[in-house]
Amino acid sequence: RYRNKAQYPVGSDGKFATIGFYASMTHRIIDCADCLLQPKEFAKITDIFRDWIRMKKISVYNESDGSGIIRHIYIRKAVVTGQIMVCIVANSDSVPHTEALIEQLEEIDGMTSIILNINREKTNVVLGKECKTLWGSNYITDELCGLKFNLSPLSFYQVNHDGAEILYNKAKE
């Protein structure tokens, strides 16, 4: 479980919301309950999203016609501080029923930041340029090689914290 970031596409199998990963060489989303490369909290977060989308009847993005609201769920966890950021990537500048979602997400240990990212472009680029903080901080903080980094959804940061630290320390030698 070495990855500190995940970007899950959100779609529909025709009946239910699917949150997971693209099937090889396609844009068909395979629902994934857990990924052993990512922190355990990520599975709990995606479960909360699945239930929220179903219960509140939130529309999911349809790539072919550009309709629907929820496009991706983007999650980061700072390895050293344990802080977690959840970013809802939406095809709209507002999402209905976020209060119910936030109420559940804020109960997760380490939850620090819940952000809405707006991406109305008909593109396969995950994040749009605009972010709105829905709850908590607009960034999480992590440490790498003794330095502190404030990470927003738009920040670049190595997904393998420990591997990056080894490489950077080797480069310093």
Locations of the language-model features?
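Accessory RNA-recognition modules of RNA-modification enzymes
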Residues: 1-173
